[in-house]
Amino acid sequence: MLDQVCQLARNAGDAIMQVYDGTKPMDVVSKADNSPVTAADIAAHTVIMDGLRTLTPDIPVLSEEDPPGWEVRQHWQRYWLVDPLDGTKEFIKRNGEFTVNIALIDHGKPILGVVYAPVMNVMYSAAEGKAWKEECGVRKQIQVRDARPPLVVISRSHADAELKEYLQQLGEHQTTSIGSSLKFCLVAEGQAQLYPRFGPTNIWDTAAGHAVAAAAGAHVHDWQGKPLDYTPRESFLNPGFRVSIY
């Protein structure tokens, strides 16, 4: 099933790129929480929803662009968790650092994940405890890698005072910044060793990247040391967390 989900992510990426390259208008509007949404978000959402309903008609889907109410999803044990365009701010800035995120959740855990960066044409995927990166038609298994000093990857668009204080206390390290779920993927492929997050995220922002990072050997825990959990709950917000090889 992983190959079909990867192809679905590519199809969604193609729909996004039609807006990104100007073939179709971007049409940026603000949602109720003031976050931006574009025609590309909606186009990718439609592609993924149609594809998953065909691929697995018995598994419900939670997408950022049309999340079901709590009364609908409170008893879900297995479901798809989708962010059709993660990094909308990066998309609007046209820096290429946005992704298509698709994850399969089973009893609170992301057991399959796909993160596709359309501009870079890079696909990260994970299933059955293994993670891969596909680039230029070549697919290879990836895993975490230690480095000294460690490279800490941080958000391009969401810096905060807590993060600054954390980094000051961390000891010797280097930093890099990138948008969207690519932060998880940098840790997964051994380029970075730590991704700390204090600012708010939603479950669709993290599930696919979580699957990839965990399958590559990283730990994805909240600041109390518990694995991020995707068991249905009323709020979509995650706690703060860190993705680490240590």
Swiss-Prot record:
UniProt binding sites for substrate: 64, 85-88, 205
Subcellular location: Cell inner membrane
Catalytic EC class: hydrolase
Needed co-factor(s): Mg(2+)
Record flagged with keyword Metal-binding: yes
Annotated function: Converts adenosine-3',5'-bisphosphate (PAP) to AMP.
Protein's UniProt name: 3'(2'),5'-bisphosphate nucleotidase CysQ
Native species: Escherichia coli O6:H1 (strain CFT073 / ATCC 700928 / UPEC)
Name of encoding gene: cysQ
